[in-house]
Amino acid sequence: MSALTVEACGPGTTVQDAGRTGFRRFGVSTAGAMDRLALALANVLVGNHPGTAAVEFTLVGGRFRTVDTTVAVAAVGAFLTVDGRPIPAGSGALAGPGASIAVGPARGGVYAYLAVGGGIDSPPAMGSRSVHRRSAIGGGPLGPGDMLPLGPDGADVPRRLPLPEPTTGPIRLMFGPQDDPFTDAALAALTATDWTVMPRSDRMGCRLDGAVLPHARGFNIVSDGVVPGSVQVPGDGRPIVLMRDCQTTGGYPKIATVIGPDLDRLAQVPPGGTVRFAAVARTEAVAAAAALRQRIDGLAALARPAGADPSSEDLLALNLIGGVVDATAVG
């Protein structure tokens, strides 16, 4: 059987794919990868569909071993080695039977991904292999000794891709659906404050500190639907942005909603990091979501075999002139 054995990993390591859609009306959370573009990049590097199940790491990496198989592997967001051999960022590699696969801590963010050719073939639950920890739907966190079955065609030719530059700028949101219970001062403070991500943030919610957002009419409402991206404000006035593992209903007013593509960016801000929000119109939010889908769908066409020479298009897409100095000014 093609499989990976877990030898070591951090407590926040789970299997995630594109998420569990269509079941929120039954009280089932979406789950899924916290950074969908990073998941897609890792999968395309090993020849998988962008939304295929992979291993998601939270801050801490892990160590794995292949069982009776040769598979393509790739990591995005962390340093990867196969039998001690460093694998360049943006490139997949083949791992033979019994190979040791090591993933380092997350670099420049919170979440990193290990994709394996053929994908993680754990039993699907409601159309997804994503783990939702609080309900145990899809299983639970990974630990030493766990064995991850792999799908077929895992030894596909590994690929390489120029990794995109990190997107900068404020996190975009739309006011509402319940911005009316807040004072004008609260609405202004939401986009004028440098917010700090608190250590208690997790896959369920990103807790922020930096200002108190006053309620105009109390903080309790009749519970209604929430979605990933909803910005709830409880009684202490400090906002909580709901993330992929969030519940399906809530009883705090929702001052705003973070747009989908920027929720992935927010997920990668580490505890102690700062974020700023900017309000956008619905048309911009819809356009941003469409652009992310188009970007993910187009990744496979950009991929090249990992050992091939770079094309002229690849070279033009990369910044190859780093560290230039003026020699005449030295000495």
Please report, for each region that a protein language model flagged, where it lies by residue.
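Conserved "landmark" site that anchors the functional core of diverse proteins
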Residues: M1-G331
